[in-house]
């Protein structure tokens, strides 16, 4: 099969190359458009809906290695040497992580949150994503030291409300306005001008009723 360009194709390529060499490029090869001038980010691509499980392959291998083995469990002693002290023995799977040990301690009500727990083996802090199979636990080093420090940033349970038996505050007493005394004072000031006294009294009584 011939790969040579036909007449029209050869003519197009020839003219294109000729035009491309007539003028120098206005922009250098290293030119990049400033971000402030970018108005279009191109065609949006759909989100890839896939959750990559980083530890899946390793867990699968551990599961295959455990098949046919009766004594695959990892026996651990979780010991807290600070008050209040405790010691818990439990069988875990080699594919379990340090995070799952912390969750077990929470289920045993030894802590309220994972952030409060720190596990150590031979003085080294164990990270949450570490597999028990990586610890190479033997009967001689099967004790994990537990340190629990309450986290002050975790909100505590709300305090109990005050006893309802405490006496309720007495309702405010309604004030009694001495209208007669006020009227007598007005008569004295207005020299018994009944029209002026009546007008002022009406305004005072109306304002008092609106202020209630």
Swiss-Prot record:
Q: Which GO terms describe its cellular component?
A: cytoplasm; cytoplasmic stress granule; cytosol; nucleus; TRC complex
Note the Gene3D superfamilies from the entry: Get5 dimerization domain, Phosphatidylinositol 3-kinase Catalytic Subunit, Chain A, domain 1, Single helix bin
Organism from which the protein derives: Saccharomyces cerevisiae (strain ATCC 204508 / S288c)
Which GO BP terms, alphabetically?
A: cell morphogenesis involved in conjugation with cellular fusion; post-translational protein targeting to endoplasmic reticulum membrane; protein insertion into ER membrane
Q: What are the alphabetically sorted keywords of the record?
A: Cytoplasm, Nucleus
Keyword RNA-binding on entry? no
Q: Where in the cell is it found?
A: Cytoplasm, Cytosol; Nucleus
Where's the Ubiquitin-like domain? 74-152
The keyword Iron belongs to this UniProt entry's keyword annotation: no
Q: How does it assemble?
A: Interacts with GET4.
A Pfam match is: ubiquitin
Superkingdom classification of source: Eukaryota
Q: Which residues form a coiled coil?
A: none
One further remark on this entry is: Present with 6510 molecules/cell in log phase SD medium.
Q: What is this protein called?
A: Ubiquitin-like protein MDY2
What's its job? Required for efficient mating. Involved in the production of alpha-factor, the KAR9 and TUB1 location to the shmoo tip and nuclear migration into pheromone-induced shmoos.
Region Disordered: which residues? 150-177
List the GO molecular function terms. Answer: protein-macromolecule adaptor activity
